[in-house]
C-alpha cells in the first residue's frame, strides 16, 4: 500500500523562538488623588498601558471609577465612617496623578440591616437637588421612629400624616442647603455628618426618631467639564515619585538544577 504525505505534519522552520516580553514592562503606575476636602489625598494606585502611537494612556484612564472607604480617607473621624463607601471618577490626568471628582457614596448593606428594627416605622425619602455649580445629586434618606419616654405600648408606629410631614421637611431642608453650595462643599456636608445632624434636629419635634441616616448619594448629571474648577477643587497636589521610580524587571529563566549523583 502506498503511503501518502500527511498534510497535518508541517516541517519546523529554522526561525528561532520568539522572545517573550514581560507584560508589566508595557505598563505604567498612576496615583489616584482625591479632592482637597479629604484628609488622605492619594488613596490608591492603578495601572495602565503606556502610550503607543494613537493609543493614548490618558484616554483610557478618564472615566474610570475607584472606590474607597470613608474611614481611610478621613483618619480623624474614627471608625464611625467605616460603613460608608465613597466612589470617585477620574476627570483629568496630570503627569502620574489622576485627578478625581466625587461620584457616589453608599452605606454598606450590613449597616442598613443593623439599623432595621421591629415595632417601629421606617421613613424613607428620595430627594433630587442641584448644586450651585450645576451638579445634580440624588439623596436617599432613611429614618426610624422610637418610643417616647412615657410610652407604655411596645410599638412606636407613626401616623401617615406625620410620615409625610417628615418627608416633606427632609426634602425642603436638603434642597435649601445644597442649592447654595458647590459640589466640594456639598460633599463636606455629607461626609462630616453636618447635613445629617441638621435633618435629625429639625425632624425630631415632629416625631421622635431613633436614627436618621443618608443611606445613598449619587451624582445623576454633571455640568460641562471645567479644568480650572477641577484644579481649584484639588488645590496643591502632593508629589509622589514612587510611580516614576518603579522599575519592572524582565522575567528570566532560572538555570536548571544539576542532577546529583
From Swiss-Prot:
The keyword Cytoplasm applies. This is Small ribosomal subunit protein eS1A. It is found in: Cytoplasm. It comes from Trypanosoma cruzi (strain CL Brener). Its main location: cytoplasm. Component of the small ribosomal subunit. Mature ribosomes consist of a small (40S) and a large (60S) subunit. The 40S subunit contains about 33 different proteins and 1 molecule of RNA (18S). The 60S subunit contains about 49 different proteins and 3 molecules of RNA (25S, 5.8S and 5S). GO terms for biological process: translation. Residues 1-18 have a biased composition (Basic residues). Keywords: Cytoplasm, Ribonucleoprotein, Ribosomal protein. Belongs to the eukaryotic ribosomal protein eS1 family. Residues 1-23 are annotated as: Disordered. GO terms for molecular function: structural constituent of ribosome. Pfam families: Ribosomal_S3Ae. The keyword Ribosomal protein applies. GO terms for cellular component: cytosolic small ribosomal subunit.
Amino acid at each position: 500500500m502506498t503511503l501518502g504525505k500527511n498534510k497535518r505534519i508541517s516541517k519546523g522552520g529554522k526561525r528561532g523562538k520568539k522572545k517573550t516580553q514581560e507584560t508589566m514592562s508595557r505598563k505604567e503606575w498612576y496615583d489616584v488623588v482625591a479632592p482637597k476636602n479629604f484628609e488622605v489625598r492619594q488613596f490608591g494606585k492603578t495601572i495602565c498601558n503606556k502610550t503607543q502611537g494613537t493609543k493614548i494612556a490618558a484616554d483610557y484612564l478618564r472615566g474610570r471609577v475607584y472606590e474607597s472607604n470613608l474611614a481611610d480617607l478621613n483618619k480623624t473621624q474614627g471608625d464611625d465612617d467605616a460603613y460608608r463607601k465613597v466612589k470617585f471618577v477620574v476627570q483629568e490626568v496630570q503627569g502620574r496623578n489622576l485627578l478625581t471628582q466625587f461620584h457616589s457614596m453608599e452605606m454598606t448593606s450590613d449597616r442598613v440591616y443593623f439599623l432595621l428594627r421591629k415595632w417601629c416605622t421606617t421613613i424613607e425619602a428620595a430627594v433630587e437637588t442641584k448644586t450651585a455649580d450645576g451638579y445634580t445629586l440624588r439623596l436617599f434618606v432613611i429614618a426610624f421612629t422610637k418610643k417616647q419616654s412615657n410610652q407604655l405600648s411596645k410599638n412606636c408606629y407613626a401616623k401617615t400624616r406625620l410620615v409625610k410631614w417628615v418627608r416633606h421637611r427632609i426634602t425642603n431642608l436638603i434642597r435649601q442647603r445644597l442649592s447654595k453650595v458647590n459640589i466640594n462643599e456639598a460633599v463636606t456636608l455629607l461626609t462630616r455628618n453636618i447635613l445629617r445632624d441638621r435633618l435629625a434636629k429639625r425632624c425630631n419635634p415632629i416625631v421622635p426618631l431613633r436614627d436618621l441616616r443618608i443611606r445613598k448619594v449619587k451624582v445623576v448629571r454633571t455640568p460641562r467639564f471645567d479644568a480650572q474648577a477641577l484644579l481649584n477643587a484639588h488645590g496643591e497636589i502632593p508629589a509622589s515619585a514612587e510611580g516614576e521610580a518603579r522599575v519592572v524587571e524582565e522575567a528570566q529563566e532560572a538555570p536548571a538544577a544539576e542532577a546529583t549523583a
